[in-house]
Curated annotation (Swiss-Prot):
It is an enzyme of class 2 (transferase). A motif (PRPP-binding) lies at residues 101-113. The keyword Signal does not apply. Gene3D superfamilies: 3.40.50.2020. Homodimer and homohexamer; in equilibrium. It catalyses: UMP + diphosphate = 5-phospho-alpha-D-ribose 1-diphosphate + uracil. This is Bifunctional protein PyrR.
Length: 180
């Protein structure tokens, strides 16, 4: 893999998350009845950052959950035989019935991860709405899924890969574009 360019630096990521937080509050008329759910792995720290920004803006703490969608994926047959997929129960840690659930992920690509996340959420409860926030939307949908809140739209080719690095896991914040 060869690095082509850095798309977002740490300051750009923070600005994008601040804007997304304001958009979430504006669309939902405040933070009441909201639940943020980070899709593992990098959606979780992004959701935590949005939660903190909403707290700074509105002085309320929006409930935060984590979602592992491994068993909801429709591409498990493509996992190599040496890799056993982990079987994890869905536990968001709160009642989401009649709440506005905001799913947070790092990169929106084909839409398959989001579809799996929506299936998992619906197995746990019946939210009023499910909305989607993504730090990067790179296009190439295979399913009719669109993000409500996007940090940056980055049109890519099939031969490019978007890599999100976050300080919580990677020691630095950066979004880069690589060529396969």
């Amino acid at each position: 893999m060869k690095k082509k360019t850095e798309i977002l630096d740490a300051a750009s990521i923070q600005r994008a998350l601040t804007r997304m937080s304001h958009e979430i509050l504006e669309k939902n008329k405040g933070g009441e009845n909201l639940v943020l759910i980070g899709i593992k792995t990098r959606g979780v720290p992004l959701a935590k950052r949005i939660q903190q920004k909403i707290k700074q803006i509105e002085s309320i703490e929006v409930p935060l959950g984590e979602l592992d969608i491994t068993m909801y994926r429709d591409d498990l047959d493509k996992v190599s035989e040496q890799e056993d997929p982990k079987i994890n129960s869905v536990s968001i840690g709160m009642d989401i019935t009649d709440k506005h659930v905001i799913l947070i992920d790092d990169v929106l690509f084909t839409g398959r991860t989001v579809r799996a996340a929506m299936d998992a959420v619906m197995d746990v409860g019946r939210p009023s709405t499910i909305q989607l926030g993504s730090l990067v939307d790179r296009g190439h949908r295979e399913l009719p899924i669109r993000a409500d809140y996007v940090g940056k739209n980055i049109p890519t080719s099939d031969r490019e890969i978007v890599v999100v690095q976050l300080s919580e896991q990677d020691q630095e914040d950066r979004v880069s574009l690589y060529e396969k």
